[in-house]
C-alpha cells in the first residue's frame, strides 16, 4: 500500500450543473448551510497543523463546484503559500473559469482538471442539465491560454449517450498538450441511473481509439488512478480511470475531506469516515486531531482492500457532488 500523501478537499457541496451521473435525477438536494461548512481558516489550520505534519502535502480542491465559493482565489493563494505544501490542483466544470483563470494562476495554481463529457452542445446539455457548452469551452480555452499545465479533461463515459464521442474527444490530445481521461461510470451519486444505463469498460474505449488512431503502450505514472496512453505523434495523452473493471486500490494514496469536515478514507467507504469539524470546533488541539487522522490512515489499507472485495455494491448516503468526486 502506498503512503498517503494526497488530500482532496471539497470546498462546497453546491454545483451550478446537475450532471446525471453525479446527482439523483428529479430529487431535491439538501445542501449544507454555510455554518455547516468548514471555513477557510479552519481548512488552513487542518492543512498546516494536521495534514502536513502527517506527510500529506498534495491537495486537490473539489466541490460540488469549488469556484462557486466566494473567496476561492484568496484561499488558493493562502494554501499554496503554506510552508511544506508540494502541490495544489483544482477540479472544476469550467463555467466560471474564463473569468477566474488569470487570477487563479496568479495565486499560484498551476494544474486544473476540467469536466467535459461531450463535444456536442446538445449531448452536453442532456448530461449536465445545463445549456452551457460554449461557456465551458471558453473556460477551457482560457485555462490553456493562461498556461495551466497539465490541463486535464475528464470524461465520464455513459452508454448510448456520449460513448460514440470517445475517439473525437481523444483527438483533442493530438495537436494540444492536453490530457483527456475517460472515467468508467460508477454507482455513486445516481444509483438508479447506473442500474438503468450500465457502464462501458476502458478496454472497449481503448479499442475504439486504437482502431481510428493507433495507441501506444500504457503506463501508470506516480500514484494516480489513470492508466496513460498516447496516440502516435500526439502532443498530449489519453488516460483511463477504470474503477469498475481494473482495480487500482493497491496504488491509492489519497483521502477525501468533505465540505462539512468528514474525512473519508475511500470513495466507496462511508462507514469508516471520521468527523473532524466537531472536535475542531469544540476546541481540540492539533495533536488530538492528528491522532484521529493517524488512526484512520493506519486502517486505510484494510479499508481499501475490504472495499475492493465488496465492489461498488453498497448503498451510499452521499452523492458524488457531496463527497468531492
Curated annotation (Swiss-Prot):
NCBIfam families: moaA. Belongs to the radical SAM superfamily. MoaA family. The lineage of its organism: Bacteria, Bacillati, Cyanobacteriota, Cyanophyceae, Gloeobacterales. SUPFAM superfamilies: Radical SAM enzymes (SSF102114). S-adenosyl-L-methionine binds at residues 21, 64, 115, 186. GO terms for biological process: Mo-molybdopterin cofactor biosynthetic process. Catalyzes the cyclization of GTP to (8S)-3',8-cyclo-7,8-dihydroguanosine 5'-triphosphate. Disulfide bonds: none annotated. Pathway: Cofactor biosynthesis; molybdopterin biosynthesis. [4Fe-4S] cluster 2 binds at residues 249, 252, 266. It is an enzyme of class 4 (lyase). Residues 1-226 form the Radical SAM core domain. [4Fe-4S] cluster 1 binds at residues 15, 19, 22. Pfam families: Mob_synth_C, Radical_SAM. Monomer and homodimer. Keywords: 4Fe-4S, GTP-binding, Iron, Iron-sulfur, Lyase, Metal-binding, Molybdenum cofactor biosynthesis, Nucleotide-binding, S-adenosyl-L-methionine. The gene is moaA. This is GTP 3',8-cyclase. It comes from the Bacteria. It catalyses: GTP + AH2 + S-adenosyl-L-methionine = (8S)-3',8-cyclo-7,8-dihydroguanosine 5'-triphosphate + 5'-deoxyadenosine + L-methionine + A + H(+). Gene3D superfamilies: Aldolase class I. GTP binds at residues 8, 60, 91, 152, 254-256. Binds 2 [4Fe-4S] clusters. Binds 1 [4Fe-4S] cluster coordinated with 3 cysteines and an exchangeable S-adenosyl-L-methionine and 1 [4Fe-4S] cluster coordinated with 3 cysteines and the GTP-derived substrate. One of its GO terms (molecular function) is metal ion binding. Its EC number is 4.1.99.22. CDD domains: Radical_SAM, Twitch_MoaA. Its cofactor is [4Fe-4S] cluster. Transmembrane segments: none annotated.
Amino acid at each position: 500500500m502506498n503512503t498517503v500523501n494526497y488530500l482532496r478537499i471539497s470546498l462546497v457541496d453546491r454545483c451550478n450543473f446537475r450532471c446525471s451521473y453525479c446527482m439523483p435525477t428529479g430529487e431535491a438536494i439538501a445542501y449544507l448551510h454555510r455554518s455547516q461548512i468548514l471555513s477557510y481558516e479552519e481548512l488552513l489550520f487542518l492543512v498546516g497543523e494536521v495534514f502536513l505534519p502527517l506527510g500529506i502535502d498534495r491537495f486537490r480542491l473539489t466541490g460540488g463546484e469549488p469556484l462557486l465559493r466566494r473567496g476561492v482565489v484568496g484561499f488558493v493563494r493562502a494554501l499554496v503559500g503554506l510552508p511544506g505544501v508540494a502541490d495544489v490542483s483544482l477540479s472544476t466544470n469550467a463555467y466560471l473559469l474564463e473569468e477566474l483563470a488569470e487570477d487563479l494562476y496568479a495565486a499560484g495554481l498551476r494544474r486544473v482538471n476540467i469536466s467535459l463529457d461531450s463535444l456536442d452542445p446538445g449531448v452536453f446539455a442532456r448530461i449536465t442539465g445545463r445549456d452551457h457548452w460554449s461557456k465551458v469551452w471558453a473556460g477551457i480555452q482560457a485555462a490553456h491560454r493562461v498556461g495551466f499545465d497539465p490541463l486535464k479533461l475528464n470524461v465520464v463515459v455513459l452508454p448510448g449517450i456520449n460513448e460514440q464521442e470517445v475517439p473525437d474527444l481523444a483527438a483533442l490530445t493530438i495537436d494540444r498538450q492536453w490530457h483527456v481521461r475517460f472515467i468508467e461510470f460508477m454507482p455513486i451519486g445516481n444509483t438508479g441511473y447506473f442500474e438503468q444505463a450500465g457502464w462501458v469498460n476502458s478496454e472497449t474505449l481503448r479499442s475504439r481509439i486504437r482502431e481510428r488512431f493507433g495507441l501506444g503502450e500504457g503506463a501508470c505514472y506516480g500514484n494516480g488512478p489513470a492508466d496513460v496512453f498516447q496516440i502516435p505523434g500526439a502532443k498530449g495523452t489519453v488516460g483511463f480511470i477504470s474503477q469498475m473493471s481494473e482495480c487500482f486500490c493497491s496504488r491509492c494514496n489519497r483521502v477525501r475531506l468533505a465540505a462539512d469536515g468528514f474525512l473519508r478514507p475511500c470513495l466507496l467507504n462511508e462507514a469508516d469516515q471520521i468527523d473532524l469539524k466537531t472536535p475542531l470546533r469544540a476546541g481540540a488541539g492539533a495533536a488530538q486531531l492528528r491522532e484521529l487522522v493517524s488512526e484512520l490512515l493506519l486502517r486505510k489499507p484494510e479499508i481499501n482492500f475490504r472495499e475492493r472485495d465488496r465492489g461498488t455494491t453498497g448503498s451510499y448516503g452521499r452523492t458524488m457532488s457531496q463527497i468531492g468526486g
